[in-house]
Amino acid sequence: MEHQLQCCEVETIRRAYLDANLLNDRVLQTMLKAEETCSPSVSYFKCVQKEILPYMRKIVATWMLEVCEEQKCEEEVFPLAMNYLDRFLSFEPLKKSRLQLLGATCMFVASKMKETIPLTAEKLCIYTDNSIRPDELLQMELLLVNKLKWNLAAMTPHDFIEHFLTKMPLAEDTKQIIRKHAQTFVALCATDVKFISNPPSMIAAGSVVAAVQGLHLGNTNTFLSYQCLTHFLSQVIKCDPDCLRACQEQIESLLESSLRQAQQHNVSSETKTVEDEADLSCTPTDVRDVNI
């Protein structure tokens, strides 16, 4: 019988156990006080930016999310990168031709903060179809960190999600499901300019409520009912329950519109494919080569 090597490697990242000392109430209260210090200006499109418009932010944010997903970055990288981008735009006018450069630079710095193996400048330049050079990205990195005054450890909604789940009397597998759905909502919120005005703790709490509602977990667990969970989380982050409900409803509305846009995009793509196939079958190849 021939000897065979058995590969036992797995792609699961080994993580340290959660430190209970970092999840106590004292730490949470400190985080709630600190989150305001790293918040961007709500009105920077009107007061600071001359060329950058909200829809441009949406385009570059969607591109950044796709890059982070394709590179399998940590969940915290994208929201942190968007925090850098919004804070930079809050007090530094930028030409629209340099917005993608700023987005790539924000991912570059955020991955250094959250990844064990950060994204390289060369790789990010490839994702821009080489429209920027590595030396341009490194120069923008210096400008970014100086404008942010090297205050790079900003609070994101991800920092609060684990605190909320720790306080909830649920089985670990249920927490894991809620965690994954809430993280998806957080990423979605980071792409939409309407959520700039909401503090990270509010977005995190709204995402958890939206995740529980979407999974219909309140049907089997009284604690997870809409009223109980909203009241509980509003007390944890010390906010008005109505404000939390409004944020959660805004998140669900954003999800619906995103799904609707995705479906329309799929339909238009299928229609385009059918039209291309019909065009190919009806038009002789030699006709395409005629230079009119």
Swiss-Prot record:
CDD domains, per database record: CYCLIN_CCND1_rpt1 (cd20573), CYCLIN_CCND1_rpt2 (cd20576)
Subunit structure and binding partners: Interacts with the CDK4 and CDK6 protein kinases to form a serine/threonine kinase holoenzyme complex. The cyclin subunit imparts substrate specificity to the complex.
GO cellular component: cyclin-dependent protein kinase holoenzyme complex; cytoplasm; microtubule organizing center; nucleus; transcription repressor complex
Domain of life: Eukaryota
Phosphothreonine: modified positions: 283
Family listed: Belongs to the cyclin family. Cyclin D subfamily.
Pfam family, one: Cyclin_N
Keywords linked to the UniProt accession: Cell cycle, Cell division, Cyclin, Cytoplasm, Nucleus, Phosphoprotein, Transcription, Transcription regulation, Ubl conjugation
SUPFAM superfamilies registered for this protein in UniProt: Cyclin-like
GO-annotated biological processes: cell division; DNA damage response; G1/S transition of mitotic cell cycle; mitotic G1 DNA damage checkpoint signaling; negative regulation of transcription by RNA polymerase II; positive regulation of G1/S transition of mitotic cell cycle; positive regulation of G2/M transition of mitotic cell cycle; response to UV-A
Gene name in the database record: CCND1
Localization annotation: Nucleus; Cytoplasm
Protein modification: Phosphorylation at Thr-283 by MAP kinases is required for ubiquitination and degradation by the DCX(AMBRA1) complex.
Physiological role: Regulatory component of the cyclin D1-CDK4 (DC) complex that phosphorylates and inhibits members of the retinoblastoma (RB) protein family including RB1 and regulates the cell-cycle during G(1)/S transition. Phosphorylation of RB1 allows dissociation of the transcription factor E2F from the RB/E2F complex and the subsequent transcription of E2F target genes which are responsible for the progression through the G(1) phase. Hypophosphorylates RB1 in early G(1) phase. Cyclin D-CDK4 complexes are major integrators of various mitogenenic and antimitogenic signals.
Protein name per UniProt: G1/S-specific cyclin-D1
GO MF, one example: cyclin-dependent protein serine/threonine kinase regulator activity
PANTHER family to which the protein is assigned, alphabetical: CYCLINS (PTHR10177)
Keyword Phosphoprotein recorded: yes
